[in-house]
Amino acid sequence: TGGKKDTTPPIVKSSYPTNAQLNFHQKQITIHFNEWMQPLTNPKAQVIISPNVEPFPKIEIIKNELSIKFKDTLQPNTTYSIYFGDNLKDNNEGNTLSNYKFLFSTGSFIDSLNVKGSVQTALDKIPDNTFVLLYKEKEDSVFTKKRPFYISKVQTDGSFSLENIKDGAYRIYALSDKNGNYYYDLPTESIAFSDSLTHVSSNIDSLNLELFLPEDTTLRIFEKDKTIKGGILHLTFNKELSFSKDELTATIIGNDAIIP
């Protein structure tokens, strides 16, 4: 019984503003679909906004309406790309609107430069959640401190495409992001990088990056993983520790801990 299974992906019926809108200065984007949609379970992980927006906007789907509410002022004269990947699905059959991207500019034109290429690895396959990251900052350690300006997810075949980029000089990295924060801050995260600044003044079609797992011989504590819960200090190091718990003592002096 029952009719033929619906396999048709959902369709965008309308949006405000329209896709590729210029001179956008509002705080909200609204997109309407032709049918009810599944809610997003983790928008910050499912939606890529490039350039990066902090704080991350409120993104939710209610019935057939998707809303994006920005919490702060956007940068002037900048093209923004909001990429949903394969995370827009209809409510009934889970049919996917694949690779949907919404563009807008806070200026009078859409930036149109692209950087494309491939990421290689010695592993059997590209790790899940591998991204290519572009930074405007020139220091070579920036990927351990800040979220990227532009970001693109690497496909399973290793290809990537960063689109609608403003001309300029960038640091470029690839990162197998284990914890979804777009920083290199875990010892199990593979990275790749270009040795020098990449100057984007025209399209780049064949940028190649090779992932590797850094061999860090210095014992380090990752700053973002210093947490205290219930009187227990949790520290994440960049390598395994070889002492037993009976060998470790600490002396607390004011705000400092001395570990002999």
Indicate where each model-derived feature is located.
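Extracellular interaction modules
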Residues: 200-207
